Amino acid sequence: YNEYLGTVPLEVTCSNSHVGQENIRFTPSSIKITMEDKVEESFGIAATTNGKTEKGYELGNVKILNGDTVKVAGPQSLIRIISKITVPVDITGMSESSVAPYPIRIEDKNGAVLSDIQKDKLEIKDNSGIFLQDHMATVSTNIWKLYNDIPLEVKCVGNPAPGYRISGITITPKSVNLAAEEAVYEELEGKLVLNDTISIEGITTSEDITLDVNDTLNLYSGVRLEADT
């Protein structure tokens, strides 16, 4: 390596013993290379989704099983321009959950996607130091089924004032549409009993009370209101 010129001389040999080195000519006789420091930095990584699931289903959640950070090593000039690392997942037509590898997408600070040639200069490892072969990350995609017209129920405690009685309780809306894992839906037993308890102790007039359905849904893992609700 000629440090002054930044070139490496080329040498060509011939396996035919009848051909002497003096008879071999080639061009160019050297190649110019650029050397720079190799550095490593940690970056956050997140899964993104595009497309729509099959009718009657909804995306529950998506998670990169390799962790939410990666270590990227490579030429300093290339590492410095990295701005965003994601794993795009196409959920078009999906009706079942899956665990599968997906290509890692790297964007520079101008929002441009790094080319395959640029990515080939990089080494990507998870936070444990395990290399992500072929720049692929393993993603868990959970698809939930939609359940329509799930009736709402509330619990009341206490008694109205003497001389009064409860003629009825009206819930508006009467039902909701839920996206849920099958096991969670079975746990609900076909209805959603709101966690908030309504006290009717000593009341003498009709009352309007507002309850947040999400306060109850948040007690479960794997269920939420339908996205369009």
Predicted regions and their residues:
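Structured interface patches
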Residues: 1-229
